[in-house]
From Swiss-Prot:
It catalyses: 2 oxidized [2Fe-2S]-[ferredoxin] + 2 L-glutamate = L-glutamine + 2 reduced [2Fe-2S]-[ferredoxin] + 2-oxoglutarate + 2 H(+). Residues 43-440 form the Glutamine amidotransferase type-2 domain. FMN binds at residues 1097-1154. Its cofactor is [3Fe-4S] cluster; FAD; FMN. Keywords: 3Fe-4S, Amino-acid biosynthesis, FAD, Flavoprotein, FMN, Glutamate biosynthesis, Glutamine amidotransferase, Iron, Iron-sulfur, Metal-binding, Oxidoreductase. Its EC number is 1.4.7.1. [3Fe-4S] cluster binds at residues 1150, 1156, 1161. Pfam families: GATase_2 (PF00310), Glu_syn_central (PF04898), Glu_synthase (PF01645), GXGXG (PF01493). The gene is gltB. It comes from Synechocystis sp. (strain ATCC 27184 / PCC 6803 / Kazusa). This is Ferredoxin-dependent glutamate synthase 1.
Length: 1550
């Protein structure tokens, strides 16, 4: 049945994608590709608490001041005076309430005996009066009494037009506490019930659409709105009343990706303020909704039904988190307990966690999956104030404790001016850790103490031992199915196996336990456009994290991931009992045949399984499939009613008479059927199927609710491959083990791409978009999945299954059972179609070599004429007939080509010759070439020839690996591109195999020759939208003349992300298609991640226009752009600049061997091998000819359509129309109306970029003070010294000065030419990219990203004079210091946060303690840590060396030893160098810790542990060997490379 029918009475309809009424007035509803549900936000959060609970007005004022100092973490939209939201939560100010309510004639009882509510209401007095009366009636029905109402005075003069136009009326209500409610929480529970009832009864078009209860409590009060941080105190003048007293203030500044008004999405919420994003939200909501049917609570009693639905599904992720936390708290758990359930530590592989605590987390994982994602959450109930950080430590949180009992925590240090002598401690929140101030006890309760009290409340370990069963504990049945060799080929055909899948996908999984790696992009048709029957999985594309939240690093940060999961029936979340964990524990969701046999045999009081066939009669077509599904659902209902708590769906009995129901259809259909029935959590779903075999299949099945999967035919296929010699040197058992390992790691990687760390949280999360499925199929079987172009219905799905079945069971001799060739991954005759076929490649190469436009037209015709064979969405579009104009009236080719770019292809992935040819070609035509993420040889910046050519790439890319990103590199850019994602592998980092890291590549990348490089999946300085704004600001400081470009990949919601990018002041946003090329990527990503650019581009343009942001930003697109027609359609959909990658490479000679990752390119393009590079025959003129032909064809189209300029074309979707009479058996159901939608906005709204972004550099410390101060050094190299104050709002200090020095002095200046001494708390990115000759000395503390991209400068940080705390035990600098630093020195007297020296490739530094993930991905430099490190030190470290002063002798337990060895210090020269570094540290910082180490140096030496990358050590030894053999310089390095690169399979130790 459809989503909206037959719902269990306690399970609200959450399948409907949109709510009937948008929560924000004036905000647009769903239209075209825009959907308000895709909005994201991020922010700054902070609190101040008087630890002893003493109330004062000072706390409120300091909270407001803190808010103003977090202004740069919020945002404004198209109006500078309309904020995204800000607010403050305080304790109920009794003195003020008594005074102000008394003036209204309202008698207020004693504190705690009444509640206060701040409520948004309608500006219409009549609607407001009706709403108040309804509220009063409901309160009375619940046995409580309203004491009265008052209007809250507001001042809206400072607000922008948008905020005023949607402004609610602010009102306050008072409710008396009845005598019967003696317990404080009983009163809060009743207020919760009232709030839920009144929301449902009042918030509607009939009464009051503005109605929203910001807070209703006897303890806390919230003032917030669609305000800037400074406007909070202005809008609510009563906040400045001296009687407005509190012992705590929780504040929040919001940054939304949209500009649409939303008063209620501002924070704080009732219990939390949140900085970050919950990545698992879809799954969390699905499971919370599914659990509601089982909710019972002795504390709520009959009121339980009144508070449902618990979750506001139209709210933001923060709203929903607050909803769930509130329920768990009010249903009986303490607030810290509820937080531990929702945001658990990464406990399963924690080497030092107690068994008692692990038992707590394991027990609660049986009740609820983690709410996972980057999060710093502050929480309060008015009596305690706490904060917790996500398991990955992805948001910053710093705190001060003062000697006069104040606790100040915020996203940054320095948000309030505190005299150094008042500070008792400076600290930070740590990953997964909790921080709690209990005002009743008057103290800070440490993480260990809080959690120990909670984990010891029940004997969780005993409960688990008695009830939770592992697969290993289950008895082994005797009969386990094996391989049926005789029918294997026929069954493979029935499930659509191809020979290509065996060879390319399954072989590396079975042989090596790894996913298959491929290269180039996907140029085959979408599943809905293919002539061939496709598996249903292929209609689903993986979504991924970009900008608003980061992907997770499942390789280097494996310690925070988990594949463990449970299956079975859940209990009541609100009434935990020993038997609540009566489940079966799985180490991986991929089951062997033996595992499944154990589950099938279960039949007792604890566990009962039932196996249901998922088969249908192929002769009955669609009706047969529909009937079989309905019968399956009925059988499942019956099984559950008879006590089954495990349902196994099986297609093992497939036969000539019975075809297999597509497994995904059966799993997801049943999952959603059971949710609708309210019985989903009573049962676990297991699949036994011959259909799934690759990572994507498993990921989609798990994402749609499957608990475990037995891919029995894949196991049999591995056996068959061994027998046929396709798999060698491995037996069947090992092959199956390897296969499960590859599949499990692959699924974790897919989950990590969206920022999810555990398979448990990924299950049921539905993080996919359907491309080409009809809405009726979505509503019935895949509720709440986006499917924006419609497409195939159930009839087509049935037809595809039947075609496979008929092909397998057609009468033929047994020896004619041969698998289809495939052709998905490489072009094959009779295989799947490819846009780049041998014919199109040959024609294009002839055309560009001969300069023959007529040959190009033949090539373009083959690509463009997709009437018979559809490939792409643009192939389904036609131009409407319009009055043409003469060709000479169209803007010239030269003007058009200035809009052309080549895509980001790194020096390393392609050869020097190919890379430079593209740069020369694009510079000739006035376009732009892109360095890619591998940096650029500085020699190219000034190279020229007699023709005036230049090899300097106009676009310098900044990717997560920061390879080659220096002050000089950035200074030579016309455009700097931040690579957030790549079309071929969004959510993953770039990858360069070790055999391609030749010495000349390693030199440019500042890495080790022969050692593979994998960039981190996230930018470690971009975990949210406000972080991106910071990097944009940093890079603009590093080169004020360059445009800043942000590269995104098309996915649902990319439009709202692009709006956030525009608000973050990017100059250009690039929306790449999923089909873009790559030098190396998992095949799963190449095929199944991301969406066509047509969808992403259209959504981006529509959303930017709706937000009135389109005129502020250039929109670019790329991805399989091959012809002028492609460019024309891109312009009409909203782009004004265009990128090409694969086609220019083909122009230069690429023949699409798709072996770029192997370094064996036969035409010298995708290789570093000198012998193969010699075969390169390309010429810049070939690429010039290609671009000229594209522009020529485009001009012809423009003349045909009557356009004189590109600007006139941008966004003119009214010129496009779907092709008429599409007869394709699948494509005929496609609806492109959403892509062609035109937003209805006024003529004053720009449709292309016309207004330059205001980067606000004129307000920076560099511009206002430092540039003039340092002019003698910049101009003449003279020494400059100065002392200046600094605060947290002074960001990127020194970077503009550094850029000016670099532009004049490429090699920098002599040491200490500029020496600036700052006093205070430095803002983010202090000293970013500063070159040699600059020294920044900071007396105080620093926030995140200190020394980012340091390019030779020196940074010194130490506590203020007068500080009494011990520096080495306090946080002095924030997270991600020295990210991507390439040269220089840094000395920090104190502790630093997480990810210190991530991707350091040349800086020498001394610090006194570091957080988790220190020296991650480091490739060069020296790091000295004179104290403790966090966990996972040296993960991915392939170069440089670290020295750890290991006083406690346990450093080895916190070091990731995958790529490094731990050694003792023995070399006298090395010991001398180390001592000199520490002595420098003491000299610069006066470090007490450094002095202590040096004071007893001989005793200190044995305590140092040297962390040495094994790859790096091997290279050094090889160089030494080469030098001893008489080689020198580059010859020695090349010899070392040849020696080191013999192990060609290694990729950076992975």
């Amino acid at each position: 049945m459809p989503c909206h029918e037959g719902l269990h009475p306690l399970v609200p309809n959450f399948c409907t994608v949109t709510s009937p009424m948008n929560s924000s007035h004036l905000a647009p509803q769903v239209q075209g590709l825009y959907d308000p549900q895709n909005e994201h936000d991020a922010c700054g959060v902070g609190f101040i608490v008087q630890m002893k609970g003493k109330v004062s007005h000072d706390i409120v004022e300091q909270g407001l001041q803190m808010l103003v100092n977090l202004e740069h973490r919020g945002a404004c939209g198209c109006e500078p005076n309309t904020g995204d939201g800000a607010g403050i939560l305080i304790q109920v100010p009794h003195k003020f309430i008594q005074k102000i309510a008394g003036a209204e004639g309202i008698t207020i009882p004693a504190p705690g005996q009444y509640a206060v509510g701040n409520i948004y209401g309608s500006p219409d007095p009549l609607a407001r009066a009706e709403a108040r009366q309804k509220f009063n009636d409901i309160v009375a029905q619940e046995g409580l009494k309203v004491l009265g109402w008052r209007d809250i005075p507001t001042q809206n003069e400072p607000l922008g037009e948008t905020a005023i136009a949607s402004e609610p009326f602010m009102q306050q209500v008072y409710i008396a506490r009845p005598e019967g409610l003696t317990d404080d929480l009983d009163f809060e529970r009743k207020l919760y019930v009232i709030r839920k009832l009144t929301h449902g009864a009042i918030r509607s078009p009939k009464i009051d659409t503005y109605w929203y209860v910001a807070s209703l409590s006897a303890r806390t009060l919230v003032y917030k709105g669609m305000l800037t941080t400074a406007q909070v105190g202005q809008y609510y003048p009563e906040l400045h009343d001296p009687d407005m007293e509190s012992a705590l203030a929780l504040v929040h500044s919001r940054f939304s990706t949209n500009t649409f008004p939303s008063w209620e999405r501002s924070h704080p919420y009732r219990y939390i303020a949140h900085n970050g994003e919950i990545n698992t939200m879809r799954g969390n909501v699905n499971w919370m909704q599914a659990r509601q049917a089982l909710f019972e609570s002795s504390l709520f009693g009959e009121d339980m039904a009144k508070v449902q639905p618990v979750i506001n599904i139209d709210g933001s992720d923060s709203t929903i988190f607050d909803n769930a936390l509130e329920l768990l708290y009010l249903a009986g758990r303490s607030l810290p307990h509820a937080v531990m359930m929702m945001i658990p530590e990464p406990w399963s592989a924690h080497e030092s966690m107690s068994q008692e605590k692990k038992a707590f987390y394991k027990y609660h994982s049986c009740l609820m999956e983690p709410w996972d994602g980057p999060a710093s959450i502050a929480f309060t109930n008015g009596k305690m104030m706490g904060a917790v950080l996500d398991r990955n430590g992805l948001r910053p949180s710093r705190y001060y404790v003062t000697k006069d009992d104040l606790v100040i925590m915020a996203s940054e240090a320095g948000v309030l001016p505190i005299e150094p002598e008042r500070v008792a401690k400076k600290g930070r929140l740590q990953p997964g850790r909790m921080f709690l101030v209990d005002m009743e006890q008057g103290r800070i309760i440490a993480d260990e103490e809080i959690k120990q009290e909670i984990v010891s409340q029940h004997p969780y370990g005993e409960w688990l031992a008695a009830n939770l069963k592992s697969l290993e504990q289950l008895p082994s049945p005797g009969n386990v199915p094996g391989t049926d060799a005789e029918s294997l080929r026929q069954r493979q055909m029935a499930f659509g196996y191809t020979f290509e899948e065996l060879r390319i996908l399954l072989a590396p999984m079975g042989r090596d336990g790894v996913e298959a790696i491929g290269s180039m992009g996907a140029d085959t048709p979408l599943a809905v456009l293919s002539d061939k029957p496709k598996l249903l999985y292929n209609y689903f594309q993986q979504l991924f994290a970009q900008v608003t939240n980061p992907p997770i690093d499942s390789i280097r940060e494996e310690i925070i991931t988990s594949a463990e999961t449970t299956i079975g029936g859940e209990g009541n979340l609100l009434d935990p009992r020993p038997e609540s964990c009566r489940l079966i524990e799985l180490k991986t969701p991929i089951l062997t045949n033996e595992d499944l046999a154990k589950l099938k045999a279960l039949d007792d009081d604890e566990f009962k399984s039932v196996t249901l066939d998922i088969l249908f009669d192929p002769n009955q077509g669609e009706a047969g499939l529909k009937t079989a599904l309905d019968n399956l659902f009925t059988e499942a209902d019956q099984a559950i009613s008879q006590g089954a708590n495990l349902i196994i769906l099986s297609d093992r009995q497939v036969s000539a008479e019975k075809a297999a129901i597509p497994a995904l259809l059966a799993v997801s259909g049943l999952h959603h059927h059971l949710i609708r029935n309210g019985s989903r959590t009573k049962v676990g779903l297991v699949l036994e199927s011959g259909e799934p075999r690759e990572v994507h299949h498993f990921a989609v099945l798990l994402g749609y609710g499957c608990g475990a999967i037995n891919p029995y035919l894949a196991f049999e296929t591995l056996d068959g491959m061994i027998a046929e010699g396709l798999l060698v040197n491995v037996d069947h058992k090992t092959a199956c083990k390897n296969y499960i390992k590859a599949a499990t790691k692959g699924v974790i990687k897919v989950a990590s791409k969206i920022g999810i760390s555990t398979i448990q949280s990924y299950r049921g999360a539905q993080i996919f978009e359907a491309v080409g499925l009809n809405q009726s199929v979505i509503d019935e079987y895949f509720c709440r999945t986006s499917s924006r172009i419609q497409g195939s219905d159930l009839g087509v799905i049935a037809q595809e299954a039947i075609l496979r079945h008929q092909h397998a069971f057609a009468p033929r001799p047994g020896d004619l059972h041969t698998l289809d060739v495939g052709g998905e991954y490489q072009w094959r005759k009779d295989g799947e179609e490819h846009l780049f076929s041998p014919q199109t490649i040959h024609l294009l190469q002839r055309a560009v070599r001969e300069g023959n436009y007529e040959l190009y037209k033949q090539y373009a015709a083959l690509v463009n004429e997709q009437n018979q064979k559809f490939f792409t969405l643009r192939g389904l579009l036609d131009f409407q007939d319009r009055e043409s104009i003469p060709l000479e009236e169209v803007e010239p080719i030269e003007a058009i080509m200035k809009r052309f770019k080549t895509g980001a292809m790194s020096y390393g992935s392609i050869s020097k010759e190919a890379h430079e040819s593209l740069a020369i070609a694009m510079n000739r035509i006035g376009g732009k070439s892109n360095t890619g993420e591998g940096g650029e040889d500085p020699e190219r910046f000034t190279w020229t020839n007699d023709q005036g050519d230049s090899k300097n790439s106009a676009i310098k890319q900044v990717a997560s690996g920061r390879f080659g990103v220096t002050s000089l590199y950035l200074s030579q850019a016309k455009e700097i591109q931040i690579k957030m994602a790549q079309g071929a592998k969004p959510g993953e980092g770039g990858q360069l195999p070790g055999k391609k890291v030749y010495p000349w590549i390693a030199k440019v990348r500042h890495s080790t020759p022969g050692v593979g490089l994998i960039s981190p999946p996230p930018h470690h300085d971009i975990y949210s939208i406000e972080d991106l704004a910071e990097l944009i600001h940093d890079l603009k400081n590093a080169n004020r003349e360059a445009r800043i470009n942000v590269k995104l990949v098309s996915e649902v919601g990319v439009g709202t992300i692009a709006a956030g990018v525009a608000k973050a002041h990017a100059d250009v946003v690039l929306v790449s298609g999923y089909d873009g090329g790559t030098g190396a990527s998992p095949q799963t990503s190449i095929k199944h991640a991301g969406l066509p650019w047509e969808l992403g581009l259209a959504e981006t343009h529509q959303t930017l226009v709706l937000n009135n942001l389109r005129s502020r930003i250039v929109v670019e697109t790329d991805g399989q752009m091959k012809t002028g027609r492609d460019v024309a359609i891109a312009a009409l959909l909203g782009a004004e600049e265009f990128g090409f990658s694969t086609a220019p490479l083909v122009s230069l000679g690429c023949i699409m061997m798709r072996a770029c990752h192997l370094n064996t390119c036969p035409v010298g393009i995708a290789t570093q091998n000198p012998e193969l590079r010699a075969k390169f025959t390309g010429d810049p003129a070939h690429a010039v000819n290609f671009m000229t032909f594209i522009a020529t064809e485009l001009r012809e189209v423009m003349a045909q359509l009557g356009f004189r300029t590109i600007n006139e074309m941008v966004g003119r979707t009214d010129i496009l129309e779907p092709k008429k009479a599409v007869a394709h058996w699948k494509a005929k159901g496609i609806d492109l109306s959403t892509i062609l939608h035109q937003p209805e906005v006024g003529d004053d709204v720009g449709r292309y970029c016309q207004i330059p972004q205001d980067h606000g550099l004129q307000h920076s410390l560099d511009i206002t003070q430092l540039l003039d101060l340092c002019q003698p050094a910049i101009a003449k190299g003279e020494k400059v010294t100065a002392t200046l104050p600094i605060t947290n709002i002074n960001r990127v200090v020194g970077t503009i000065v550094g850029n000016e020095i670099t532009k004049r002095h490429w090699e920098g200046l002599p040491e200490d030419t500029v020496h600036l001494h700052f006093q205070g708390s430095a803002g983010q990115s202090f000293g970013a990219f500063i070159p040699k000759g600059m020294t920044l000395e900071l007396e105080g503390d620093a926030n995140d990203y200190l020394g980012k991209g340091l390019s030779g400068g020196k940074i010194i940080v130490y506590p203020p004079k007068g500080s009494s705390f011990i520096a080495s035990e306090n946080i002095i600098a924030g997270n991600v210091c020295l990210y991507g630093a390439t040269a220089g020195e840094v000395y920090i007297s104190g502790m630093v946060g997480e990810r210190f020296c991530v991707r350091n490739s040349g800086v020498n530094t001394v610090v006194e303690a570091v957080g988790d993930h220190g020296c991650e991905y480091m490739t060069g430099g020296k790091v000295v840590v004179l104290g403790q490190t966090g966990r996972n030190f040296a993960a991915g470290m392939s170069g440089g060396v670290a020295y750890i002063f290991d006083e406690t002798g346990d450093f080895a337990t916190r070091c990731n030893s995958a790529m490094v060895g731990l050694e003792k210090l023995e070399d006298p020269e090395e010991i001398k160098d180390l001592k000199e570094l520490i002595q420098n540290h003491v000299n610069y910082t006066d470090s007490a810790k450094g002095k202590a180490v040096l004071a007893d140096w001989e005793a200190s030496i044995p305590k140092f542990v040297k962390v040495m990358p094994r790859d790096y050590k091997r290279v050094l030894q090889a160089i030494k060997k080469a030098l001893e053999a008489g080689l020198s310089g580059d010859d020695a390095l090349n010899a070392a490379f040849e020696e080191n690169a013999k192990d060609v399979a290694r990729i950076g130790g992975s």
